[in-house]
Curated annotation (Swiss-Prot):
Residue span, tr-type G domain: 578-745
Protein name as annotated: Translation initiation factor IF-2
Positions of region (G2): 612-616
Keyword GTP-binding (UniProt): yes
Length: 1079
């Protein structure tokens, strides 16, 4: 309260009236007060107090509508006097507030009781209507306007008059104000016990049941008021409109009221209900509760007491959901159950004078309320804040959801969980209206945070059908109350719990398909030990494991090259024809492999090889008397291990060449292992039988230790003794090869698409990338599209091993193919496909996979690798190289040999390697990376040489692999810093000491061993312990300075910065010598 102003609620408390009553008084006096917190001027207070007092005394009530008449009927004449005394206050209350709800009239009826405690029985009957126990169903008496037509009233039979009402225990009743139809107590006993004051005991029903709740329990603002006939005798209504006395007894219920704190009126219990009727009523309540929990919509036939309300009775139209957000129902008390509603539309709100009221204020009687008028507002005048002051002194209504609206006094909810239309309560179907508890929007945001939202209309009993949607705005009548579910928040689920994955899938894409947050997938990956980010790709195996964690399956939908490359069916036996055998010649270097092949081919391949050793793998087609044979010649040098392994993989038979005078060597053992790993049969050719020191028995013995036992020794390995020089035993060798091939039954289908392997590949300056391909099945023709490794192309030309151009190549035919996009890797599979598009797509798919593998191999610095480094590891030197070779297989061999040279002191780093001539880009790359260019069987052009000189790039050329390896070793050693080593010179014994001014102590010495030089380092030893290490400052023999003193001579010696020289000390001379470091 301010200095000269008073709030409405404070004045109401002071006068002992409700804010609603005070608000009506203020409006009648034309004093503006919209809410309970509005202030009143000090000068208006006296007039207001007089007006309120006048209304209390009954004068103010006569100013209201005189058309509403309150009549009571008693069956026995003993109550005639009580009815006469109570009639005046009733008429006054209804005259002043013609359509006031029951709690308001009850409150006004309380006021005379405050002034006059000894009230007549009728006035006490009003108090009993507020305070009788809820478990005692007593029906209210209904008033109406005489000018409105009276609908058919449902009759409620009273208890037999002969039954006296038992006395109720004295219990204090709580009165809470709530707008409800008028309700007065019907006396059910002929002997009212006026002399025994008692307070009604509030009894909550065991189970609030919808079936037992009259429809009158809907909040007053939206329910139309029924009128009774204007006669002196008003029949009581029956809940089911069938006149059943028992049902009427069961459906009558009393409501608890909150007593004004100022007065505790005493009431008198007229009658108690029949216990059997109460038990039946509770059973009906439980049945209705189960029906409501089942979610069923309340059919029209289940409408409890109160009767059917035609749709035309409720003016104002259907109020959409959300108009009453957060608002409390003024009056606070539970509405009385089961009373008749006086005829005519009952508007929402508090006092309704005849004059129209503005929006948000008091509504004109019976007038329609515009939609949105009551949103969260305070009824009596203007919008009030949520949880604002509730008239009649009620306690704040607890928050929470309630089915069909929250009922503070323990009253049962509406049947079926439906809300009171327009009243404060839940949304249809028992869902809370957004913002109804003041927290709706905020809590919804919290629930929806971080989740996908799917809006859907639920079908079924509570859902809204398509017809409802097409119908548009719904009416306000009984059939207009359709349940509309709000937007439900739930994770978006895939229609089919499958995700489609190509070869790999990003974490973000996977999360999108599964309807999850990427963080959830990353959590699972962390649990699997995979450190992933949202943009990281997962292979199909990892994706399958992760999807399984969430109950999803993985479906591979990407491009699969197997559909085009893998044969769909086996070759029929009738389509197979005999093919020539593929024979690989293997053995140690210089054991005569190529010479043997030359003798068979009657050619001279060896003469053209650098250093007389084979450094390429060659494929040759030879026609012999025994048939056609394809030979593969492999290098024997240790650097060509991969090349030998590749030859063993694509061959049918291995001929192991061993020199008779040299025996089994290292590469011989390696060749045996490669052949066994490939599962290829081995035939041994003991070469160089023409030499004097030839010992074939030694070879047979050594090979038997490797598991190759000769047939003469009881084994199954074929041995042939040959001489490439004299051609001895060659025919026998070819015959044995033919027999072995016949045993193997080598066949192939020449009518299918060609398939083979690349034996060797190179880059020719004029013809571009070339590859030697050994066709293993099918027929390769000029113009065919093919895919090989990460490259695709079309066969432009083919050449045989003699350099002749051919149009087609059948099974077991080696050809040189022109038409590649790049230099392929030796050993790659060569496959002919239908067209160029398929070939390019397969090549692109392989290129992507190869790039992913290379990126995955890149080593990243981790804590383990960082700590595992040695302290001096950072000082290790690196030799950068750019390798260029004539063919791909040789490049592979050189790269492997050079990598093996790396040591802890010097690392070899191959910046780039390729087949073909040295180009300008190679020079620029070497200049940028400070590298040396190694050329093997390649030469640069004059222009490339000029650029190399300008960029100061060193280019080295080699044609023999072991020379290349030796020079790289020397270069690595030259990068190391020289090592200093101490060299002992001699010793001298101190025999005398001399002290020379300004010079110091001079030692007179005798050279006992070696010599002492002027620039040498010295150590002074005393009793075998080093006392001083330093240099000689002066060395003299007699008075002459000398450079050195030999053994047996005497000399004078001065030491640098040291004078503590004693007789008997030994001076040892030494010098430091630098030596080249080794790897």
């Amino acid at each position: 309260m301010t200095e000269n102003k008073t709030k409405v609620k404070d004045l109401a408390a002071e006068l002992g009236v409700t804010t609603k009553e005070l608000g009506q008084v203020l409006k009648d006096m034309n004093i503006s007060a919209k809410t309970s917190t509005s202030v009143i001027a000090q000068e208006d207070l006296p007039r207001i107090k007089e007006r309120v007092q006048a209304q209390r005394d009954g004068g103010a009530r006569k100013e209201g509508n005189p058309d509403v008449i309150v009549r009571r009927r008693h069956r026995d004449g003993d109550r005639a006097s009580a009815r006469a005394e109570a009639k005046a206050p009733e008429q006054e209350a209804t005259a002043a507030m013609p359509e006031t709800s029951a709690p308001e009239r009850a409150e006004e009826a309380d006021k005379p009781a405050v002034a006059k405690p000894a009230k007549a029985p009728e006035t006490e009957a009003h108090a009993r209507a507020r305070k009788e126990p809820q478990a005692e169903p007593v029906k209210a008496r209904i008033i109406r306007r005489p000018d409105e037509p009276a609908p058919v009233a449902k009759v409620v039979e009273a208890a037999p008059a002969e039954t006296p009402a038992p006395e109720a225990p004295a219990v204090k009743a709580t009165v809470t104000a709530e707008a409800a139809p008028a309700k007065t107590v019907e006396p059910e006993s002929e002997r009212p016990q006026a002399d025994k004051p008692a307070t009604a005991r509030v009894v909550r029903p065991a189970t609030p049941d919808a079936s037992a709740v009259p429809d009158g329990t809907s909040s007053a603002p939206t329910l139309p008021v029924r009128s009774a006939e204007p006669s002196d005798t008003v029949e009581r209504a029956d809940a089911d409109a069938d006149g059943d006395d028992d049902d009427a007894q069961q459906r009558r219920r009393k409501k608890k009221r909150r007593q004004p704190e100022a007065v505790v009126p005493q009431v008198r219990v007229i009658s108690r209900p029949d216990p059997a009727a109460v038990a039946q009523q509770q059973m009906q309540q439980q049945a209705a509760q189960q029906q409501r929990e089942a979610g069923g919509y309340r059919p029209g036939g289940q409408r409890p007491e109160g009767g059917y309300r035609p749709e035309g009775q409720r003016e104002g139209g259907y109020r959409p959901e959300g108009q009453r957000e957060g608002g409390y129902r003024p009056g606070g008390a539970p509405r009385p159950e089961g009373g008749y509603r006086p005829g005519g539309p009952r508007p929402e709100g508090g006092y309704r004078p005849g004059a129209p009221r503005p929006e948000g204020g008091y509504r004109p009687a019976g007038g329609p309320r515009p939609e949105g008028q009551r949103e969260g507002g305070y009824r009596p005048g203007a919008p009030r804040p949520e949880g604002g002051y509730r008239p009649a002194g009620g306690a704040p209504r607890p928050e929470g959801q309630r089915e069909g609206g929250y009922r503070p006094a323990g009253g049962p909810p509406r049947p079926g969980g439906a809300p009171r239309p327009g009243g404060f309560g839940g949304a249809p179907g028992g869902m809370p209206v957004p913002g109804a508890d003041g927290r709706g929007d905020q809590s919804k945001k919290k629930r929806q945070k971080g989740r996908r939202t799917v809006d859907f209309q639920a079908d079924g009993p509570r859902g809204r059908s398509d017809d409802d949607v097409m119908r548009g705005p719904r009416g306000r009548g009984k059939r207009g109350k359709k349940d509309v579910r709000p937007a439900a928040t739930q994770p978006l689920k895939a229609v089919k719990r499958k995700i489609k994955v190509d070869e790999a899938i990003r974490v973000a894409d996977m999360a999108h398909q599964m309807g999850l947050k990427a963080n959830e997938i990353i959590k699972v990956l962390f649990g699997l030990g995979v450190m992933a980010t949202i943009n990281q790709s997962l292979d199909i195996d990892t994706a399958t494991v992760v999807a399984g964690e969430f109950g999803y399956e993985v479906e591979k939908v990407g491009f699969s090259e197997d559909d085009y490359l893998v044969p769909k069916e086996e070759d029929a036996p009738e389509t197979l024809v005999t093919r020539p055998p593929v024979v690989t010649i293997m053995g140690h270097v210089d054991h005569g492999k190529t010479s043997l092949l030359d003798a068979i081919r009657k050619s001279n391949v060896t003469a053209g090889e650098a250093g007389g050793i084979t450094q390429h793998i060659g494929a040759y087609h030879v026609t012999t008397k025994k048939g056609e044979i394809v030979f593969l010649d492999t290098p024997g040098h240790e650097a060509f291990t991969a090349m030998r392994a590749r030859g063993a993989q694509i061959t049918d038979l291995v001929v192991l060449v061993v020199a008779a005078d040299d025996g089994v060597m290292e590469q011989t053992r390696e060749a045996v292992n490669h052949s066994k790993a490939a599962g290829v049969p081995i035939m041994v050719a003991v070469n160089k039988m023409d030499k004097e020191g030839a010992n074939p028995d030694r070879v047979i013995r050594e090979l038997s230790e490797l598991g190759l036992v000769a047939e003469d020794w009881g084994g199954d390995t074929i041995f042939a003794k040959v001489s490439a020089k004299t051609r001895e035993g060659l025919d026998e060798l070819l015959e044995l090869i033919a027999i072995q091939a016949e045993i193997l039954e080598l066949k192939a289908n020449p009518d299918k698409a060609a398939r083979g392997h690349v034996v060797e590949a190179k880059l020719d300056k004029g013809r571009g990338p070339l590859a030697t391909v050994l066709v293993q099945e099918g027929t390769l023709r000029q113009g065919d599209a093919f895919v090989c490794g990460v490259f695709a192309g079309r066969v432009r030309a083919m050449f045989d091993d003699q350099g002749r151009k051919v149009k087609e190549a059948g099974p077991s035919t080696p050809v040189e193919v022109q038409g590649f996009d790049g230099v392929v890797e030796a050993g790659e599979e060569f496959v002919s496909v239908a067209d160029d598009k398929v070939a390019r797509r397969i090549a692109e798919s392989r290129a992507v996979k190869q790039r992913e593998r290379e990126l995955a191999k890149e080593s990243k610095v981790t804590l383990e690798t960082f700590l595992s480094r040695r302290a001096d590891a950072a000082e290790a030197l690196t030799l950068n190289l750019v390798l260029k070779a004539d063919v791909q297989g040789t490049l592979e061999a050189i790269s492997e040999a050079v990598r093996k040279l790396s040591t802890e002191k010097v690392k070899i780093n191959i910046i780039h390697g390729g087949a073909g001539a040295i180009t300008e880009s190679d020079i620029l790359l070497a200049s940028a990376s400070d590298a040396i260019i190694i050329g093997f069987n390649v030469r640069p052009t004059s222009k490339v040489k000029d650029i190399a000189e300008q960029e100061n790039v060193d280019i080295r050329f080699y044609d023999i692999i072991y020379k290349l390896v030796d020079e790289i070793k020397s270069a690595m050693a030259g990068m190391l810093a020289p090592v200093q080593r101490e060299v002992y010179l001699g010793q001298a014994e101190v025999r005398e000491t001399f002290s020379v001014p300004k010079i110091g102590v001079i030692a007179g010495c005798h050279v006992a061993d070696g010599k002492v030089t002027r620039n040498a380092g010295v150590r002074l030893l005393r009793d075998g312990v080093v006392v001083y290490t330093g240099k000689i400052t002066s060395l003299k023999r007699f008075k002459d300075d000398v450079r050195d003193v030999q053994k047996g001579y005497e000399c004078g010696m001065g030491l640098e910065n040291f004078n503590d020289i004693k007789v008997g000390d030994v001076i040892e001379a030494f010098e430091m010598v630098e030596e080249a470091a080794t790897l």
